[in-house]
Amino acid sequence: MAAVARGAASAGGEVIGVVPGSDPGEANPDCTHVVATGIGHARNLAVVASGEVVVAIGGEWGTLSEIGHARSIGRTVVALRSWTLGGRDRMEGAPGVIQAETAEEAVAAALAEL
């Protein structure tokens, strides 16, 4: 997330950080606006519900939970070298999941879903 925030900020974009704790200071310094939720991992649902398309980049357990939340509320997920759920071939063709190999592919796929 830090690299995404840095890239967006360096391009002049506004960066909204949604942090799990109640301290806005835990946000990345590149965040323009911070939402300190104080709700721990439950903030993952707030993050995915706030957008129209979810782009999952790489990821650990939190990313996997965000993918699950996104699909459970009907959000399309663009997976950029992200979770494969048992192998890339099993994720390919999964309803509501679009695979991307590059950032450009991910952005194009996300914009096409809007």
What are the residue ranges of the model-derived segments?
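Short acidic-hydrophobic, aromatic-tinged amphipathic segments that line or gate anion-handling sites
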Residues: 34-38, 95-109
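Conserved catalytic/cofactor-binding microenvironments
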Residues: 80
